[in-house]
Each structure stands twice: as C-alpha cells, then as structure tokens.
Amino acid sequence: MLKKHPFITKDELERITKKYPTPFHIYDEAEIMRRVRLLQKAFSWNPGFREFFAIKATPNPTIIKLLRDLGCGCDCATATELVLADACGVTGSNIMLSSNDTPPEDFKRAAAQGAIINLDAGGDMLDTLDVALGGVLPDSICARFNPGGTFESANGIIGNPADAKFGMTEAQLFETFRVLRDRGVKVFGLHAFLASNAREQDYYPKLARILFELAVRLHRKLGIHIG
C-alpha cells in the first residue's frame, strides 16, 4: 500500500493563509506533472495510450488545462462536465462520456463535441442513444463491463462488482455489441471500474487481464475489433 506524505509544511501553510483566507484547496503542480509523466512512460509501449481524467474527481479548470497540456483527455459523466471539458480546450475523441441513466440531451451534446460514448447498459440506454442521434450511430462506441462477483487483490477483497449498479454482464455486453455491429459500428472499446480508490499494486494488472481476455472472446465470437 502506498503511503501519503504532506507536500507542504505547517509553516508554509501558515504563511499562505496570511495572504489567502481559508478554506481553500492547494495542489502540487510539479507532483501532478511528475506522476502523469511516469504513467505515460509506463505505457509508452502503446503509442495509442491516453489517460482520461475523471472531471468529477476535481472539476477545476486549472487542473483540467494542466492535464490537457500533458496530453490527457477528460472522462465526463454529465452535460455540465462536457461543457467544462470543451471550455478547457479538450475536444473530440479526447473526451469520453461515461454516464448512467443518461438523458438524450447528454448523448446529443457528446456526439456534437465528437466525444467517445461509453455505454453503461444496452437495452433502453441503447434505444435512448439511437433516438437522440436520429438513428445514426458513431463509428466507435465503448461499453462498461461488470464481471459480477468480488474483486480480490493480494490484500483481500477490494471491490464487490456484483453489488454495483454500473456496467453490463458478459451476456449483456455480447448482445449489445452484436446489435451495434449490425448497426454499422466499426470500433469497440471496453471499460471497467471494479473498485474505488484502489491503490493495491495488483489491481490494474488483474483488471487488464480480465479486459484483454474478454476482448479475445468478443473478437472470436462476433468478429469485432476492440480498438
């Protein structure tokens, strides 16, 4: 487990409060940049890699612009966040809409901005997307997978996907991708979020294995390309 250490001393904070009244948030710009670059270096083997920052985590325009300048995209959950991403200069496929119970207006805005749409469900949500876009689906669509059960690391259970309302079962995902394939979608993406605030070192390797193995099954059964 990673240990957290303050990046500023008590004396420095007291000096800052003499100029800026509390409450306020303070960020370590240099450390943010260092960590983003470390992440990008770790995935440099993949020339198509891009980190998408979840705006809901810190909807701060200064932070979003800093991450934009470092090559990051934005993960949005609402129309408001889509507007914020656009206002911060993040455009097109550098934006992803990952939402639940999405209204048609959000789908319309995402499509107008050229964002990648990440479906949380098929069925009614797919129907809503279809109506919102006038029956013309984008060439690329992503979908969220929920494998169910529990998600364990070396330190024990860190997530309970079976209890989460987000994402599709494998059967639902296959059916949704089959429908999308038959409707002309060319490139498919996979997304999964199985635990909040996961800091265990084996979380992402295990999650990556789940998604890569699922991608192989989807390709073999449906003949689709997981981009």
Where are each of the predicted segments found?
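Short beta-strand segments
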Residues: 54, 140-146, 191-193
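A charged N-terminal "starter" segment
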Residues: 1-119, 123-139, 175, 180-182, ...
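Active-site loop/helix belt of alpha/beta enzymes
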Residues: 147-227
